[in-house]
Amino acid sequence: MSPHKDFQSSSTPVPVCMENDPNCDLLRYLIALAIFIGLIAIFMFGCKAAMRLLTRKRNRDTTQSDTDVIYPRDDPRASRSHQNFGFMDPPPRYEQIFKRGGGTPSVITTREAPSVTRSTGDGSLPPSYEQAALNARRESRPQLPQGTLREVPLTAIDMEHPAMSTPSSTVLDMESEITNITNHAQACVHRYDASHANEVTRTAVAVTTESPAPAQSTSNALPELEAPEGGPPGYDTISLHNETVSTR
């Protein structure tokens, strides 16, 4: 082979993609797709590594539940200001208030501690629950004698009216009262109904004719209207009947 031919074969130009060549467009699409898949794989690998680190850190640290946040445990590293928002002692737990062995709960009531006092140790710090209870009991004993204390439950309050004679009269019989009101309303409707207007007129005429003269009357009292025979009882009769029933 001649050197001229070797130089000619080695200097052959590399084919360049043309603008409208479909093979070049397919090659570019495959390269872009490979780069996109690689980026997604790198992102997922990074997320998985971060999750592993968070899981290891969570397992190392002590887990705190909602109860531990409200009632923090006795941790020597925790300061007093973080336990109960500035108070010395945290609020009592359920097992501290209601112990399994029974007995009175170790809580401060309004009767035992009418006022919160400072502890005898450090005046700048608020007292503990036990110290406040002890101070309140010591102060309440000499001031309030035991004989003057009287606990009255709500169910034992005397609700009797002073004018009532017996405690049974304080209880209202609602059924009988409702029945009396209903009967009275029905009697009024039946008495002053349009169909009984003639009876009312006849009663009024009879009263006016039988009433004495105004000069002979000794008082200004109005004459009583009497109900017709066979009709319903009057208002006064019903009222007297209700009064007698209520007094019984």
Swiss-Prot record:
Membrane topology: Single-pass membrane protein
Annotated region (Disordered), positions in chain: 59-91, 208-248
Identification of the protein by name: Uncharacterized protein M01A8.1
Record has Transit peptide as a keyword: no
Sequence ranges of Polar residues compositional bias: 210-220, 239-248
Gene Ontology cellular component annotations, sorted alphabetically: membrane
Main localisation: membrane
Compartment list: Membrane
Sorted UniProt keywords: Membrane, Transmembrane, Transmembrane helix
This protein's record includes keyword Transmembrane: yes
Membrane-spanning residues: 30-50
